Amino acid sequence: MEAAADGPAETQSPVEKDSPAKTQSPAQDTSIMSRNNADTGRVLALPEHKKKRKGNLPAESVKILRDWMYKHRFKAYPSEEEKQMLSEKTNLSLLQISNWFINARRRILPDMLQQRRNDPIIGHKTGKDAHATHLQSTEASVPAKSGPSGPDNVQSLPLWPLPKGQMSREKQPDPESAPSQKLTGIAQPKKKVKVSVTSPSSPELVSPEEHADFSSFLLLVDAAVQRAAELELEKKQEPNP
């Protein structure tokens, strides 16, 4: 009987030594698993938290940077002096400002430009400015083209009837350069000279065009008479054969 009692005791002792974990309660197992899950959740949440903190800048600093970019939206590349000035205003480092502008030129700047184009008030002002500059450029170019640059341009101007004395100064022919005109003037009858004497008495009967043509004819007659007098003097000075 003692041997039989010792036998079962010996068979139970190795089982108890080999499997101590099986004797734990289910409540302890669930608590251990919940702790492990909480630890893994914290480990996974740390990188996301750090990532969010990395890109967040103060709202006042971002507003200053956005205002500067809007003013210089057509050339949003600040120089070193401008970066230093923005750094003092925003209390940010030069590296942070440089990185913000790199990202803003890709994400914020296109929206700014598109918003300016879609704004009807700004677009209307831009159209008015362009029209005004176009008018100024055309007004500046017209005097340069219309101004006389030489004697050819002066001759192309419209002619108006001028007083008799002024026409005589402008249209007086050179006696040496126009011999054919002298000969035609000599061949004209002298009766028309008498008509010129009567013309001043009745200026209202003579049109401006006829008056202009008649004055030029008188100049030719005067030149012809002067030339005839010179020829007579030359004949008198020549010795008789």
Curated annotation (Swiss-Prot):
Annotated compartments: Nucleus
Region (Disordered): 1-58, 126-210
Matches recorded under CDD domains: homeodomain
Expression by tissue: Specifically expressed in adult testis.
Key word Transcription present: yes
Database matches in SMART domains: HOX (SM00389)
Positions of the DNA-binding region: 48-111
Record family assignment: Belongs to the TALE/TGIF homeobox family.
Full protein name: Homeobox protein TGIF2LX
Source organism of this protein record: Homo sapiens
Lineage, broadest ranks: Eukaryota, Metazoa, Chordata, Craniata, Vertebrata
